[in-house]
Amino acid sequence: MGDLTILNIISFLLIFFIGLPHGSFDGAVAALVGFNKRFQFIQFLFYYIILFSLVILFWLYFPIFALSIFIIMTIIHFGLCDWTNFRINKYKYSVSFTYGMTIIFGIIFFNENQSFLIFEYLTNDKIYLIQKYFFIPYFLTILSIVYFIYLSIFEKKLRKGVIEILFLLIIFYLFDPLLSFAIYFCFFHTYKHLKHLVKNIYSNLTNKKFVIYSTFVFTVVSWFGGLGIIFYLVCLLYTSPSPRDNR
């Protein structure tokens, strides 16, 4: 992947210390969906850790399939979050698809070589088996953006989305994939996600102390986990040859 630059390190720090902790509200979300008793919350944590461990194992044995599922889930998550931010009851799938595809494949399109070097480490080089098919999501992304612009003619609330998408595409064009993702993840997605999440949590949960306590614990854990991942990546980049070198 080459040397780890200052911008790469800044990107990792932004993701782990600003973006990643927005998942720290998972404990509060669990309470919202029914895990609101002490024993139930312990059950949630148990399931959470088991699922996380299974995902890691699955990724190790089936990296291409796991990465594909991760990309699809990321597209859905980002897209739905951005659709919710518009506060409209229509065009759910069109808006979600456009935003999700634009974020993921916009970054990859403008930084394909660097993006595939990252995927190379995540999949042990096997990603190149499907690289030639990436023209399909690129084409679908362009079509979705054109359709989104068309919808904005009839729905005024979407017009700010056109400006936002164009602004994000400029960012993706100017910066490398890690920094591009960090900018979107931290300053666009996290802000929208937290705004929606905090509003729902504080209007539906009476135990505010639980929200604060669980969020604090999850945040600290995510920060330590983030530091561990950064340390691991630094060691990996400087001690291991690129998978491409083994071809």
Model-derived segments and their meaning:
Residues 1-19:
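N-terminal signal-anchor module of multipass membrane proteins
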Residues 3-6, 58-66, 172-180:
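Transmembrane helix interruption/hinge and helix-loop junction motifs
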Residues 47-56, 78, 162-170:
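Hydrophobic, membrane-inserted alpha-helices
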